[in-house]
């Protein structure tokens, strides 16, 4: 083996992946246990799937499908990084990227790499739906906080604007409106954007400025 290629990984360098599975140049391309290496890599919460393929005459390719953090859940002074399934990817003392802080989930414990075992599963279902819609409309790096303490009366926060979503009836429309309206509001402006009325086709969207 003279060359090792990596594809699909942003959380890990190719060198880090090789270190995890004990792969190095000079190894026998055909005798290296690819299946065992794939299982080892998939133990990482960030790696959804791994595939090693030998490319003759002397190249090994590591293809990774990663899980992505979609939000942070505060927990005892730390933050749980969760993906779009509610899986705990990492526990850290700070938030690295611009992703929403998720409030309102109730749980007593967790296991890294597993789905967060919340008591209020309806709230988790709501946050997963919202995060997918916010990814669709490229809002994940804009939203500061999402509060699902009351799954039928949801609030989100962008800059100094409180956004009242209400429930997730017409959720796609609400998040689309949110994306369109928020970008027109100057960051220094304070106010309340009420999208909850979109449950009713005849209702209006309102914005109340706060001083």
Place the predicted regions along the sequence by residue.
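Aromatic-capped interface at the extracytoplasmic side
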Residues: 1-9
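Charged, solvent-exposed interaction patches on well-folded alpha/beta domains
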Residues: 16-28, 36-39, 43, 49-51, ...
């Amino acid at each position: 083996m003279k060359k090792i290629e990596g594809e699909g990984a942003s959380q890990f360098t190719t060198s880090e992946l090789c270190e995890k599975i004990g792969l190095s140049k000079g190894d026998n391309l055909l005798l290296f246990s690819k299946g065992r290496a794939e299982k080892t890599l998939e133990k990482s919460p960030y790696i959804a799937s791994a595939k090693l393929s030998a490319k003759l005459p002397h190249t090994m390719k590591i293809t990774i499908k990663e899980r992505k953090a979609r939000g942070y859940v505060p927990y005892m002074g730390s933050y749980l990084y969760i993906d779009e399934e509610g899986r705990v990817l990492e526990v850290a003392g700070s938030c690295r990227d611009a992703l929403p802080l998720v409030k309102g989930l109730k749980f007593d414990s967790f296991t890294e790499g597993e789905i967060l075992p919340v008591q209020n599963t309806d709230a988790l279902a709501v946050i997963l739906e919202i995060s997918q819609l916010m990814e669709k409309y490229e809002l994940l790096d804009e939203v500061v906080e999402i509060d699902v303490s009351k799954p039928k009366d949801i609030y989100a926060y962008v800059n100094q604007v409180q956004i009242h979503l209400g429930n997730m009836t017409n959720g796609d429309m609400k998040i689309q409106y949110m994306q369109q309206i928020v970008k027109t509001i100057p960051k220094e402006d304070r106010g309340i954007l009420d999208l909850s009325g979109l449950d009713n086709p005849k209702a209006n969207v309102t914005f109340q400025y706060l001083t």
